[in-house]
Amino acid sequence: MRVDLNSDLGESFGRYKLGLDEEVMRYITSANIACGWHAGDPIVMRRTVKLAKENNVQVGAHPGYPDLMGFGRRYMKLTPEEARNYILYQIGALYAFAKAEGVELQHVKPHGALYNAMVKEEELARAVIEGILDFDKNLILVTLSNSRVAEIAEEMGLKVAHEVFADRAYNPDGTLVPRGKPGAVIEDKEEIAERVISMVKDGGVRAINGEWVELRVDTICVHGDNPKALEITSHIRKILEEEGVKVVPLKDFIG
């Protein structure tokens, strides 16, 4: 049994520091690096790519809405042309730094409100996928487990990694509970570990109302901006390995 462990990193910018990138990077296998629109800047992007390389962590683009003030967590209505080119632009920006450091891009994981909007809006999902395909059809799209987005991507010829969230609560329909609601973000490492093992070994988890949600697991996300990110990530890695689960990058098993 194999699974990837990912985190959203490189989200500092200018004088503002966010996340525990150096510490978390030691325990993950794939890094989703912000591309400068919802967070990140050229200096941070290159440093994060270099840090990933030093830790043998695979690099992926983490594009979002052009919303630095809102950290990409506010919905924006985009035309298909805008969505397609916004994605292409951001992947290209990260690729420049990856190439400079001798690193290949493994995947693309949309950020925040864009990630969630793609689950609800098929036209948006198709436009984002087209933007990825424009750049490189060999990239892997990281998206919500068992979502329509995954189906669309596969129909369009893009490889997919089904993602689950270690530190987020689920609705009965398999979507994430909005961050503003009580219980949406889980911080207890033991509860998180139990949920992760349930997802990986039992193929699902209990939703916030107690209903069972079936989930396919290729990659597990731990948010780097969680105050307990280091503690949680290291504990998840330890528990998975104790349970006989191999923690490896997506490229090793998504073909």
Curated annotation (Swiss-Prot):
InterPro entries: Glyco_hydro/deAcase_b/a-brl, LamB/YcsF/PxpA-like. The keyword Hydrolase applies. SUPFAM superfamilies: Glycoside hydrolase/deacetylase. It comes from the Archaea. Its EC number is 3.5.2.9. The keyword ATP-binding applies. Gene3D superfamilies: Glycoside hydrolase/deacetylase. Belongs to the LamB/PxpA family. This is 5-oxoprolinase subunit A. It comes from Pyrococcus abyssi (strain GE5 / Orsay).
